């Protein structure tokens, strides 16, 4: 959060601080900054969703606003992509210059879309799944048309299928999941573009408990059963269709996370995709 809203030096100062009392104050300041970032991020996402509705028929969503902080537009773009299941550019406006962050998937390359608009932008680049762009504010509408024309020129098929997370391991039940497995997977870090985190899928798991968390019940914790074992899974800012009912069967694609509390370690699932079956 320090790097997104101000400077990453604040986090570095905390790590280097030797005085415990000063370190505590610096940690508190960072925590306050993180809360501020979450508030700004949430407000920006709400505005972006409203603006996206005006362009809901576009193949590529391009939303812009003067209130967007360019430190969090990438996070907002990820939120829009998850909600609308389309490539997204979120643009912050500051006077005559605008800065955008893109998130994409499948065969639509965000960086190629930016390069295709080279005549109307100031600069830009990135990779297939994410890119950045700087352009004159007056050219935002032209940029929106350019990236949508580029999408149409590709004549893409089955894009939505490519939005689904890849599955590395198909599970019959939860028996292979353990802290030891999580620790072995952790040796493969850092994960990112070109080194994806391993994913798992289980089908027809039964929901035996559901907990909604957060100030707006936007976070979800499910306890699933394979018939013999139980396994908890989490999804922050979960889509509405992920909130399965008790006794409902679900297919879930997930990665692994570790929950440490009072010296106890427990593996939990991080939900990437959930498909509800029938009650």
What are these regions (language model features)?
Residues 228-244:
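Beta-strand/loop nucleic-acid-binding surfaces
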Residues 139-144, 246-279:
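OB-fold single-stranded nucleic acid-binding module
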Residues 1-145, 159, 166-171, 213:
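Hydrophobic helix-and-loop "lid/oligomerization" segment in the mid-to-C-terminal part
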Residues 63, 221-226, 234, 269-272:
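Short, acidic/hydrophobic/Gly-rich beta-strand patch recurrent on exposed beta strands
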Residues 171-231:
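Accessory interdomain/linker segments of ATP-dependent helicases and helicase-like nucleic-acid enzymes
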Residues 96, 227-230, 264:
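Short acidic/polar mixed-charge low-complexity motifs
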Residues 97-101, 209, 266-274:
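Noncatalytic, beta-rich nucleic-acid-contacting surfaces in large DNA/RNA-processing enzymes
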Residues 151-161:
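Flexible helix-coil linker/hinge segments at domain or subdomain boundaries
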């Amino acid at each position: 959060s320090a790097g997104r809203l101000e400077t990453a030096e604040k986090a570095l100062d905390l790590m280097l601080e030797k005085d415990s009392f000063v370190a505590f104050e610096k940690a508190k300041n960072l925590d306050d900054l993180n809360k501020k970032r979450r508030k700004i991020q949430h407000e920006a996402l709400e505005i972006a969703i409203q603006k996206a509705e005006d362009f809901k028929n576009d193949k590529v969503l391009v939303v812009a606003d003067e209130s967007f902080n360019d430190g969090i537009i990438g996070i907002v773009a990820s939120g829009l992509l998850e909600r609308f299941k389309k490539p997204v550019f979120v643009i912050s406006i500051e006077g005559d210059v605008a800065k955008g962050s893109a998130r994409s998937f499948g065969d639509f390359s965000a960086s190629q879309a930016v390069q295709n608009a080279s005549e109307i932008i100031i600069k830009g680049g990135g990779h297939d799944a994410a890119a950045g762009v700087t352009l004159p504010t007056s050219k935002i509408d032209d940029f929106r048309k350019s990236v949508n024309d580029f999408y149409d020129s590709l004549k893409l098929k089955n894009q939505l299928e490519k939005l689904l997370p890849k599955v590395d391991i198909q599970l019959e039940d939860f028996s292979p999941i353990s802290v030891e497995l999580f620790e072995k997977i952790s040796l493969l870090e850092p994960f990112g573009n070109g080194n994806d985190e391993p994913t798992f899928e289980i089908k027809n798991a039964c929901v035996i408990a559901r907990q909604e968390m957060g100030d707006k019940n936007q976070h979800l914790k499910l306890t699933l059963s394979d018939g013999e074992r139980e396994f908890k899974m989490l999804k922050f800012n979960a889509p509405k269709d992920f909130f399965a009912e008790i006794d409902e069967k679900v297919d879930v694609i997930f990665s692994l996370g570790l929950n440490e509390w009072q010296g106890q370690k427990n593996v939990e699932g991080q939900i990437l995709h959930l498909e509800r079956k029938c009650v």
